[in-house]
């Protein structure tokens, strides 16, 4: 099924036409495997997070049949405990461990698809998948509210990653929105997301330090745990460390390497706090990575002008499509990363040691 009306496909004047957006989505769909999996590139591996990101982009661009096939892959490959393997290639599991963020992201993708299509039957089909996934993830929450990054057969890896937890925070809020839609209250999720949001906003010491990475910088804003002045201050504090004028943003602060997906995620974070001028600037800046077929190179080493790695990743194009939708306000899902109508859980309605110690 193809939604034919290009008026319903995002475009950003002067940067991207709806036809180009659809072309990028088709490049993603062309990599899809018969199982519905959306790998990094044709013949590459699939991970559950980027797979869902790709499905969201297909939904935005009106390629609903491959999007549904992708969500069906999520449903049929989910394990009984609610998880997915970290990495699969051509149907063969290459890493059987479970990443909490990878497992949670299905909630964001499903809610996004429901927002755009209004398809209640799809919601009913995917609700058990989302519920099992979020229960699995919340079971990995540590005493401070942060969520362990992975689980193996031998148990939890009891380290929490800020980027992953910020994304999980957003995914649980999407799961709560879906729960409301389905009439299925989830009080445990409300408590868990409140504790997680507090940890992200107030307890940086709870997370493994990865300050070199740009995702650590913008993800607390993108995920919605930080808003208002705290979010603006965080973005401004390290702007010059990561932003390369005219090219996008560095993946890490000490390498001359800009990456398209990170730049588009920054666009989403900027859009979420109303910094639209800089959001549009960064969106335009990353388009040097576009190829004639609508695909996008992952990044550029700008001191020698070489593409690196030598791959055009589906999820780079997907991040671009989601950013285009946010900036253009095109589909009914365009506000998902602004947190439009997403529940915030029980924020401030529980006792943290940092609060009780001040009483």
Curated annotation (Swiss-Prot):
Effect ascribed to mutating residue 262 to A: Loss of activity
EC nos: 3.2.1.221
Keywords: Carbohydrate metabolism, Hydrolase
Keyword Hydrolase annotated: yes
Domain of life: Bacteria
A Gene Ontology BP annotation from the UniProt entry: carbohydrate metabolic process
Class of enzymatic activity (EC top level): hydrolase
Function, as annotated: Hydrolase involved in the biosynthesis of 3-O-methylmannose polysaccharides (MMP), which are intracellular polymethylated polysaccharides implicated in the modulation of fatty acid metabolism in non-tuberculous mycobacteria. Highly specific hydrolase that catalyzes the internal cleavage of MMP. Is able to hydrolyze purified MMP into distinct lower order oligomannosides but does not cleave acylated or deacylated forms of 6-O-methylglucose lipopolysaccharide (MGLP), beta-mannans, synthetic 4alpha-oligomannosides or its own reaction products.
Name under which the protein is recorded: MMP endo-(1,4)-3-O-methyl-alpha-D-mannosidase
Gene: mmpH
